[in-house]
Amino acid sequence: MIYTTTETIPGRDIIEIVGVVTGNVVQSKHIGRDIMAGLKSIVGGEIRGYTEMLSDARDVAINRLVASAAQKGADAIVGIRFTTSAIMDGSSEIMAFGTAVKLGPSR
């Protein structure tokens, strides 16, 4: 499966738009990370525990996005974007979305 943030794929024509596909995950914060994050915010700097958590969550969202497109018979996903939002206190959602397409042969 080809997936990209661009609207086109070099050397390939989009022959059919399958539709919008999404992949999301809601990730809760770990109480230990929350305590360390609070301390880190006092002195400044990167909160690595949260950075790792969001990176892992983004990977899950991408995997779900690709699975959704494959289930619909797509060859690729173009125009991928990400959103992040707070769902409730202590948890965040990461959503990946894009357009599932079918591709013609290589030019």
From Swiss-Prot:
Pfam families referenced in this protein's UniProt entry, alphabetically: YbjQ_1
SUPFAM superfamilies from the UniProt entry: YbjQ-like
Source species, domain of life: Bacteria
Family classification: Belongs to the UPF0145 family.
Entries under PANTHER family matching the protein: UPF0145 PROTEIN SCO3412, UPF0145 PROTEIN YBJQ
Listed HAMAP family: UPF0145 (MF_00338)
Protein name (record): UPF0145 protein Sfri_2095
Lineage, uppermost ranks: Bacteria, Pseudomonadati, Pseudomonadota, Gammaproteobacteria, Alteromonadales
